[in-house]
């Protein structure tokens, strides 16, 4: 258990740092204000799959809070929570044991993408906008538009780049029973 907690702490630090750096360097704007294509969610998917839902939550939450603080001066807490929840849900989208054994085929890809799509819909289409209305008194039409666009572009980003990262990772793992004794 202690070894696992050390892995989670290290993964959280590295993952949060990558979340900040990628979010800072690769930020592709959309026509909707304050909404952009964010490639760090693909990395969040990889780390969440490898280290579990808790690490995923911490990486998303801490990474987003730091990114907002560095780029905008203060975190937008409802969306910071959203990133944490995305990491949490993404951690449930992949069977970690299978992935570390090199198994990430069509069945696993479909499962992962169903989970990530539903998570994006719930987090960015409902939780973050409702939080913006309740916490920041933002106009509903504005925040739901931002949430829907963010959810769609994040779902697409994770479907393409996140799936690719997971597939590439699985390809580096040796499947059990594939080594022969000579």
Curated annotation (Swiss-Prot):
Pfam families: ECF-ribofla_trS (PF07155)
Highest taxon in the source lineage: Bacteria
Stretch forming the signal peptide: none
Chief place where the protein resides: membrane
Membrane topology, from the record: Multi-pass membrane protein
InterPro entries reported for this sequence: ECF_substrate-spec-like (IPR009825), UPF0397 (IPR022914)
Residue intervals passing through the bilayer: 8-28, 42-62, 74-94, 114-134, 146-166
Subcellular location: Cell membrane
Gene3D superfamilies: 1.10.1760.20
GO cellular-component term (any): plasma membrane
Keyword annotations from UniProtKB, A to Z: Cell membrane, Membrane, Transmembrane, Transmembrane helix
Family: Belongs to the UPF0397 family.
Protein name: UPF0397 protein LLNZ_01795
Origin organism lineage: Bacteria, Bacillati, Bacillota, Bacilli, Lactobacillales
């Amino acid at each position: 258990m202690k070894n696992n907690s050390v892995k989670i702490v290290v993964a959280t630090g590295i993952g949060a740092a990558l979340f900040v750096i990628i979010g800072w360097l690769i930020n592709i704007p959309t026509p909707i204000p304050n909404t952009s294509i964010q490639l760090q969610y693909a990395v969040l998917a990889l780390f969440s799959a490898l280290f579990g839902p808790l690490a995923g939550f911490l990486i998303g939450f801490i990474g987003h809070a730091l990114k907002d603080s560095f780029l905008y001066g203060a975190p937008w807490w409802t969306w910071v929570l959203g990133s944490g929840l995305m990491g949490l849900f993404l951690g449930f989208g992949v069977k970690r044991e299978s992935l570390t054994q090199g198994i990430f085929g069509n069945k696993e890809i479909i499962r992962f993408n169903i989970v990530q799509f539903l998570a994006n819909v719930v987090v960015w289409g409902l939780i973050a906008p409702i939080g913006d209305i309740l916490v920041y008194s933002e106009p509903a039409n504005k925040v739901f538009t931002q949430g829907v666009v963010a959810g769609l572009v994040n779902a697409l980003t994770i479907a393409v780049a996140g799936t690719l990262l997971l597939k590439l990772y699985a390809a580096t793992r040796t499947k059990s029973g594939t080594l022969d004794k000579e």
